[in-house]
Amino acid sequence: LSICIYMHLLFISSNRIGDSLINLQVLNKYIRKNKKNIEVTLVSGSLPMPIYDDYTMISKRVILTKQKYNLHWFKLYKELSAFRYDEIVDFRSSLIGYFLRVKKRNIFRMKKSKNIYEQIHHKFDTDLKKDFKILTDRVRNIFPNSNYACLAPFTNWAPKEWPTEQYVNIAKYLIDKGIDKIFI
């Protein structure tokens, strides 16, 4: 007789693709820590939803479309209130986690004056090598013979910006790894 205990995680990500990619390291950490014995309910905007296509542990996907007067939160509450979660990770700093049946709440509150990557790493104790590996492996499987990379050294908000030297370092690293073309 084998008993498999699942963690039920409610993961509320972003509407933007870039933000969702940043948040993905946290989801990967939960998967790694729970040895894939995890069931995830994902809430995300429609644009970044394909990022999660290969995540088989996502049992429910909810596209959150913003509405006037924040009515999207009431709609989301109606959709999720029948369920119980072991933990919520909320990158939108919403109040919904306080109204749902959740054992543990991780509400990410961005400090506008600090770097977002450092804030996420400190709050969730992510491991850059291990927690980005799932995404990297998936991209390699989708594009096995690709030999190019795209860098986008711009953001829509100052705390997400990296110093120019970081992009130069990434480009050098990619070239050292055999990338022939880098598009900016």
Where are the predicted features?
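Catalytic machinery of carbohydrate-active enzymes
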Residues: 1-184
